[in-house]
Structures are given as structure tokens and as C-alpha cells.
Amino acid sequence: MPSGSSAQCVKPLLDKRIPLVFFDRAIDGIDTPSVLLNNVMVSHSLTQKLIEKGYRFIEMVSYSMDLSNIRGREDGYKECMREAGLDCFVNIHRVEHHESSSTIDGIMADARKRGVEAFVFATNALAVQGMSAIFRNGFNIPQDFGIATFDKNDAFDIYATDLLYVRQPLESFAKELIRILVGEIRGDQEFGAAEHIVLGAEIVNKGAGR
């Protein structure tokens, strides 16, 4: 699971022909075997589910990180909103990881004043912070805000509320990662012939809400 600044660490491994598989994220300019989620498609579908529930003024909360999975989720949101004719509502709040909690609190308070109806969160950690901020500000879910996010969090079970979340195929990820890595170790796959696996995901509707 490479970070945005890990290219300089990965290249020496490839030069030494050490078996390597990227999981969850890719690095621009480095072609190595990978098992990834189709973040654009899944984010598009997640946003579409909110639209089908009747929401129109939908914004997104994301991280200000240059990571391929985060960029893909942002692209999927924007693409879906454009296709639905909701370009005028497209707005991505990019927050710093170490300041996300305080920043999101302000985002939620301001969003209510502007009439925002729903949010897509790029990660479940952001969603938990967003939900906490919503309740601290005296708002409710889904009456005041609709929520859609990537991945489940145990905190969702604590909040008696309705939301949409992406359930990633973790078992499929594990099987493909092991299959590719074992193949590299055995020499079944020619070095440099990178195999790229892209998986879909399930969208879960927790509760019967709007």
C-alpha cells in the first residue's frame, strides 16, 4: 500500500528484481503488478445512490493527499455529478490529515447554512469525524444530511442512523495479491510483465432512510 512519497523507496526494490505487488494504490510512472479497487467506478456508483435517494446538493470531503485511490474517488464523484447535470453543486473539501477533525466541524456548520443536502466521504475515518461534527452542531442524519462513504467503521453501529458505505472485496484482494506474489517468487511471471487486477465493490445501504 504505497504512500504518495514512496516512489524513491520502490525503485531500488524493482532494480534488485525483488517480488513486489501494489495493493490499494498505484504510483504514477511505476509499472508493477497491482491489485486495486476501481475507485472511479465505485465512487460514481456511491454518488449515484445518493442522487437516487433524492439528494442534489452533494459535496465531498477528502484528504489533501496526492494518492491514486483518493484521486480516483474524487474523479468518480465529479463525473457522476456532471452526468446528472449537477455540476453547479460540485465541491470537494480537501482537509489536512492532522487537522481534519477541527476543519470538518467548520465544514458541517457552514454546509448547513448553504443548504448542502449530502456528503460523500473519501474514507471511513473522515465519515466518522463528519458524523461527529454533524451531531455536535445539533443536526441529524439523514434528516439534515445524507452520508455516503468508503468502507465500514464500527462506529457506524453505534450511531442509530442511515448511511451508504462501500464494502470492498477484501477476500478477493487477498487471493489475488497472494497469487501474483507467489507467481513472481516462483518465476511463473516474467519480470517486468506487470499484471494489473482491478476489482469492484458492493454498496451497502445501512438503514432505510430517505
Q: Model segments located where?
A:
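Flexible loop/turn connectors
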Residues: M108-R210
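Short acidic capping loops at alpha-helix termini that bridge into adjacent secondary structure
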Residues: R56-I58, C88-N91, I141-I147
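Short beta->alpha junction loops
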Residues: N91-S100
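Hydrophobic alpha-helical segments within soluble ligand-binding/sensing domains
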Residues: P33-M60, E99-A109, A127, Q168-G187
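Flexible loop/hinge segments that line or gate small-molecule binding clefts
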Residues: P2-S45, A125, D151-L163
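An alpha-beta-alpha
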Residues: H44-L86, F191-R210
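Alpha-helix capping/helix-boundary segments
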Residues: S5-S6, M65-D66, R73, A125-A127
